[in-house]
Amino acid sequence: MDDFELYDDLEEDGPSDPISFFAEEIDFEPANPALLRRWIQKVIAHEKAELNFVNYIFCDDTYLLKLNQEYLQHDTLTDIITFPYHDPPVVEGDVFISIDRIHENAHQFGVSFEQELNRVMIHGVLHLCGYEDKDPADKAKMTQKEDEALLLLKTVD
């Protein structure tokens, strides 16, 4: 993973856009990125946090497993890894998401790919806002916040 880098200066969306989407070793673009940006900004404002930048990097299981092994010393597949670069309430970080896991989890949970992707994307933002999910109480709070955020998505034009 010598090529791991901060994604805030890449050319895709430009450094002026605080929410950027990239793909690493896969061909993927989220549906309706403009709507997703407005939604994420609304959630961050709802959490009374300050957005500096969030980079979403969509990848496959292999890529995310390597990050998990190298940076977290976990030898397991995961759907998301969030790297915060600032303490809350400042939102600044990279969110790596395995599209392979999103497909599999959507099937397992009986939801659409888009629903699962939205939940995982906002899960990363909530980590950057300061929410944890290490113990049962924190997991319950995180799920509640995800549900609130998903309801906010319905209010975004």
Where are these regions (language model features)?
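Short active-site segment of divalent metal-dependent hydrolases/proteases
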Residues: I122, L126-G130
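An acidic/histidine-cluster motif and surrounding catalytic segment
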Residues: M1-L117, C129-D157
